[in-house]
Amino acid sequence: MNKQFHSCSPDPDDGEKLDIDYLSDEGPSTLIFEPSELIDFRVAWDWQKQRQKLLFEKPGSSQAVWLLEHSECYTLGRGATEDNLLFNLSNSPWDVYRIDRGGEVTHHMPGQLVVYLVLDLRRYKTDLNWYLRQLELVLLDTLKDLGIVGKRIDGITGVWINDFKVASIGVGCRRWITQHGLSINVDCDLRGFERIIPCGLTGSKVGKLSSLIPDLKTVDVKPFIKKSLTERFGL
């Protein structure tokens, strides 16, 4: 299959129509969206850029969090090397996006829960390292609530179960307003990771939660993610 490589702009195009449903300011200080269908990566990123733009222009606006699943794609961080792609970009199995987050290449697919957060860190702590560690704690809280012992590894962002990495984190931030977030492998097909060096970690093994809890689905994990986000970010 010959899929496209996309190098995407960090801002919506001038004159781009904003998605009104995802820009509503009515309700709580943080809006949480849980679309039930698979979301194309470009659509989800547009939602984040629109919300970030709104927070730039109206700093008191509501923050936003999305819990969703993507159709298959790969994403590369802003400084990621294409050497971690084990295929030719001209013959990619799925679409590939270079985006404005940190980190190397990762893979998204159905059965993986992705959480995007557009938060104003000035409401919390203007420290990106603190923010990354909070996202790791959200993942560890979630695993604990599921009866699973997870761990962090010093110097490497993410969460592991034994020797298997089950969750990745990659964020972008402009003027202390965040984009992107985290992903956790629940009941997904992991074979797409064989085409990349995940997160640039040579020899790293990738796992999923359903290997430990058969029949676990993303819908089962969402309540625990939301619980921890509420506790740690006051959503």
Curated annotation (Swiss-Prot):
Binding-site list for substrate: R101, G102, G103, E104, V105, T106, H107, H108, S168, I169, G170, G181, L182, S183
EC number in record: 2.3.1.181
Biological or metabolic pathway of the protein: Protein modification; protein lipoylation via endogenous pathway; protein N(6)-(lipoyl)lysine from octanoyl-[acyl-carrier-protein]: step 1/2
Residues covered by the BPL/LPL catalytic domain: 59-235
Catalysed reaction, written as an equation: octanoyl-[ACP] + L-lysyl-[protein] = N(6)-octanoyl-L-lysyl-[protein] + holo-[ACP] + H(+)
CDD domains on file: LipB
Site positions (Lowers pKa of active site Cys): K165
Active site positions: C199 (acyl-thioester intermediate)
Top-level taxon: Bacteria
Places the protein is found: Cytoplasm
InterPro entries: aa-tRNA-synth_II/BPL/LPL, BPL_LPL_catalytic, Octanoyltransferase, Octanoyltransferase_CS
Keywords: Acyltransferase, Cytoplasm, Transferase
Biological processes per GO annotation: protein modification process
Pfam family, one: LplA-B_cat
GO molecular function annotation: lipoyl(octanoyl) transferase activity
UniProt signal peptide: none
GO cellular component: cytoplasm
Miscellaneous comment: In the reaction, the free carboxyl group of octanoic acid is attached via an amide linkage to the epsilon-amino group of a specific lysine residue of lipoyl domains of lipoate-dependent enzymes.
Role of this protein: Catalyzes the transfer of endogenously produced octanoic acid from octanoyl-acyl-carrier-protein onto the lipoyl domains of lipoate-dependent enzymes. Lipoyl-ACP can also act as a substrate although octanoyl-ACP is likely to be the physiological substrate.
Protein family (similarity comment): Belongs to the LipB family.
UniProt-recorded name of the protein: Octanoyltransferase
Organism: Prochlorococcus marinus (strain MIT 9211)
